Amino acid sequence: MACVRSIGSLTSVNHSQRNVPRSGIVLSSCSVLPIKSSSFTGSPVSLPRAQPSSRTALRPMKPVSITMMVKPALQFIQGTDEMTIPDVKLTRSRDGSNGMALFSFDQPSVFDSSGEVGEITGLYMIDEEGVIQSTDVNARFVNGKPEGIVAKHIMRSPKEWDRFMRFMERYSDQNGLQFVKKQ
């Protein structure tokens, strides 16, 4: 799987005594879930490679990596952000080797659009580092009508815990959540 990252570089071109910036797009590997369908209907374009003239001297500089910011989001259906802010409960073992996050959604917006957009396939936690996925998702029903969703995410290593906490920090900053330690 590959993702697109923008790499900018400044190449000095001796043309009319000025510097001309250039940028490119580089494919690099990262952990991103594949998109099953897309509304993009573009067509491939081939551009001729620019050839510097004999009077032009190219002196490439080091490429500079540009980090693209992604708004942290929770999704039950890939591509459809959940608008309801959940109640999140965290537990962690005493030795820190594993932990669990329990997300409780009351009247999630996915119930309004799930028939039109698709089926709930899991809980996807998306931020600039990639996607964290949990498939342990259960709906609560009251009198035959969907009332809420409970999703469980299990972290089996300190590395998974740290990654989840980085996501939650970004998500809570974006949505005004606050960490309250149980007394």
From Swiss-Prot:
InterPro entries: Psb28_c1_sf, PSII_Psb28_class-1
Organism: Arabidopsis thaliana
Places the protein is found: Plastid, Chloroplast thylakoid membrane
Primary localisation category: plastid
Pfam family, any one: Psb28
Protein known as: Photosystem II reaction center PSB28 protein, chloroplastic
Keyword Plastid: yes
Residue intervals passing through the bilayer: none
Assembly and oligomerization: Part of the photosystem II complex.
Any one cellular-component term (Gene Ontology): photosystem II oxygen evolving complex
Family membership noted in the UniProt record: Belongs to the Psb28 family.
Transit peptide as recorded in UniProt: 1-49
NCBIfam families: PS_II_psb28 (TIGR03047)
Gene3D superfamilies, alphabetized: Photosystem II Psb28
Any GO BP: photosynthesis
Membrane topology note: Peripheral membrane protein
Keyword check for Chloroplast: yes
Keywords: Chloroplast, Membrane, Photosynthesis, Photosystem II, Plastid, Thylakoid, Transit peptide
